[in-house]
Amino acid sequence: MLLLASASPARLRLLELAQIPHRVRVSGVDESSIENHDPALLVQQLALAKATAVSDGIDADISSVLGCDSLLLFEGEVFGKPQDGEEAAARWRRMAGGSGELLTGHALLVRSGENRLACISTRVHFAAITEEEIQAYVTTGEPLHCAGGFALEGRGASLIAGLEGCYSNVIGLSLPWLRSVLRDSKMDQSASG
């Protein structure tokens, strides 16, 4: 069984759709306390901090703990969740018609003592949208809860022109990566047991 260290409904939904048995325990990590100038390392450090924070005292049936964190790298600037609607609208004015890299850090702590860390990157092409469309989207409140200020699994999907890379990564969890490391960790456990 997997323990997801996240309050993200989107990550939870991905695990449900993939039929990966899981439970959820929110980490409560203060993300602002972790700094790194390298965005790829930052998301991995945040993911590891989240997984580590919930790993103490886990039930015996939990074989691994997963932490994730995402951000958008756009024109060299790191975009996490917007602070308010004004910031979300300002970002969308910049992003409209452009492209950015959605980075998701993954940290899988396996009971055998292994840590699997990865940063998965997906190129996101944003549609050229109008000010009216930006305001309509920001008014929904959806962009305030998502790294980069958009939700591919929600209303934001219509504002995305295309993707290069892992679709589920943009939602917050690379299912191909997770399946691969879970499969590898099961093989390692059966080989050592």
UniProtKB/Swiss-Prot annotation:
EC numbers on record: 3.6.1.9
Membership in a protein family: Belongs to the Maf family.
InterPro entries: ITPase-like_fam, Maf-like
Annotated protein name in UniProt: Nucleoside triphosphate pyrophosphatase
A molecular function (GO) term: nucleoside triphosphate diphosphatase activity
GO cellular component: cytoplasm
Cofactor(s), names only, from the UniProt record: a divalent metal cation
Keywords in alphabetical order: Cytoplasm, Hydrolase, Nucleotide metabolism
Main subcellular location: cytoplasm
Compartment annotation: Cytoplasm
Record GO biological process: nucleotide metabolic process
The reaction(s) this protein catalyses: a ribonucleoside 5'-triphosphate + H2O = a ribonucleoside 5'-phosphate + diphosphate + H(+); a 2'-deoxyribonucleoside 5'-triphosphate + H2O = a 2'-deoxyribonucleoside 5'-phosphate + diphosphate + H(+)
Cell cycle listed as a keyword: no
Function of the protein: Nucleoside triphosphate pyrophosphatase. May have a dual role in cell division arrest and in preventing the incorporation of modified nucleotides into cellular nucleic acids.
